[in-house]
Design a protein with these regions (language model features):
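N-terminal signal peptide c-region/cleavage motif recognized by signal peptidases
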Residues: 13-15
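Noncatalytic, solvent-exposed loop/strand surfaces
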Residues: 17-409
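Hydrophobic alpha-helical targeting segments used for export or membrane insertion
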Residues: 6-10
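Positively charged n-region of N-terminal signal peptides that target proteins for export
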Residues: 1-5
Length: 409
């Protein structure tokens, strides 16, 4: 992402509609595509690719879809610029590019990037977060890529492991909720989407953690949930007031929790390994645990069963209420991206650019296909209107390049 960001043509994007994929893990925060979507199960460079677009820089954020606009964050690591690209959803043409920050890049893990947090949108504005100069900064852009406001949210200075920042922001009504967990300072805050002003804030345990906050309607109320820091924590998303916290898991998790009517499920991490089901009513009841580690990935819940793909590329299915293992199947690792559910079909990409397609069938593992695009895939795909948007990379070092694919019939 070089100075071309400052000169690309700016066009107008349309407003949001019901089919948008407006934030990390989709409009409902569960990585489940809207009902009725029908995405190809097989593709290649020459099959079922509607278009492909070059993405400047490097990033692991997922595509965000707002009407006819696709948004990606990215970073030029050599030039130390972080910014946002807008693409035409119909053609893949780049419509605009905006630099949000320059300089101050921290050290990061080689599997992380300086643009790993996924953008979110309320249909009026786009919201992004970046880590630089020992802080987390949030910015709001209009749908033409013009910056509306920028706000320093809080410090982020990891000490023990300098692996960078990854938590994606989420929206609740007129607030943008952002978390920053490190072993020197840790917080979760809500910002006014119109001004960037802090509406509420809460301190969190000073521990290394990379999970994203998510708002869920569970156990009869709206709850802001974050895993990691050796707990699952719940807050009132309107005020930030702590509702409950349950000791479990381990210090560091990266995945986002999933939930059903009354239970929250999470997995991680480092240094211990655990997958856990916790009642979301504050009772402290842990329904079940096991020793599986889905560290980078978030899980799926569908028809009373949990589906997951762990770091090593093993797919799992558990009964949600009992934790009973229904099956496990080795695919191929390593895996960082999270699986996405389309109807009763799961799509799971590994770090080598292979996407495995299999049924969400609790009775047995039912493989459908495996597809290859590029040589690297860390970003979780998104699905809107029968099209899957997949961010992949090819090459290494100075020859590495990223591509955004639109896959559909």
């Amino acid at each position: 992402m070089r100075t071309i960001l400052l000169t690309v043509l700016i066009l107008t994007a349309s407003s949001t509609h019901a089919a948008d994929w407006s934030q990390w893990r989709g409009p409902n925060g569960n990585n489940v595509a809207a009902a009725g979507n029908n995405v190809p199960t097989e593709w290649s460079e020459t099959q079922d690719v509607i278009w492909k677009a070059k993405v400047l820089g490097r990033g692991h954020s997922s595509p965000t879809v707002i009407g006819d606009l696709i948004v990606l964050t990215s970073a030029d690591e050599q030039g130390q610029q972080q910014g946002v690209f807008g693409f035409d959803r119909r053609t893949g043409d780049q419509k605009w590019g905006t630099v949000v920050s320059k300089g101050g890049f921290p050290k990061t893990h080689n599997k992380n990037t300086h643009a790993s947090a996924t953008a979110c949108s309320d249909g009026r504005q786009i919201y992004v977060t970046f880590n630089h100069h020992n802080k987390v900064e949030a910015a709001a852009l209009d749908l033409q890529g013009k910056i509306v406001w920028q706000q320093d949210v809080g410090g982020f200075v990891p000490r023990q492991y300098q692996y960078g920042y990854a938590a994606s922001p989420t929206l609740y009504k007129n607030t943008l909720i952002i978390s920053g967990d490190s072993d020197t300072v840790a917080w979760v805050k809500a910002l006014d989407t119109r001004s960037g002003r802090v509406v509420w804030q809460q301190n969190r345990p000073q521990k290394l953690n990379w999970s994203s906050p998510i708002v869920a309607n569970v156990a009869g109320k709206e709850q802001l949930l974050i895993s990691g820091c050796e707990q699952i924590a719940s807050y009132d998303p309107a005020t930030g007031r702590p509702l409950w916290s349950q000791p479990c898991l381990t210090m560091a998790t990266c995945g986002t929790v999933v939930w059903d009517n009354d239970t929250v499920y999470a997995s991680g991490g480092y240094p211990k390994k655990e997958t856990v089901a916790v009642k979301a009513d504050g009772s402290g009841q842990i329904l079940w645990t096991n020793g599986t580690k889905c560290y980078e990935q978030s899980m799926l819940i569908h028809d009373g069963h949990i589906y997951a793909v762990d770091d090593n590329g093993i797919a799992w299915c558990w009964h949600a209420k009992t934790g009973q293992e229904k099956w496990k199947q080795r695919l191929q690792g390593p895996v960082s991206a999270s699986p996405v559910l389309v109807g009763d079909t799961i799509y799971a990409s590994n770090e080598r650019g292979t996407t495995f397609v299999f049924k969400a069938n609790p009775q047995r593992f039912e493989a459908i296909a495996r597809n290859q695009l590029g040589t690297e895939s860390f970003a979780t795909p998104t699905v809107v209107d029968n099209v899957m948007y997949l961010r992949v990379a090819s090459g290494q070092g100075g020859g590495r390049s990223e591509t955004l694919y639109a896959i559909g019939n």
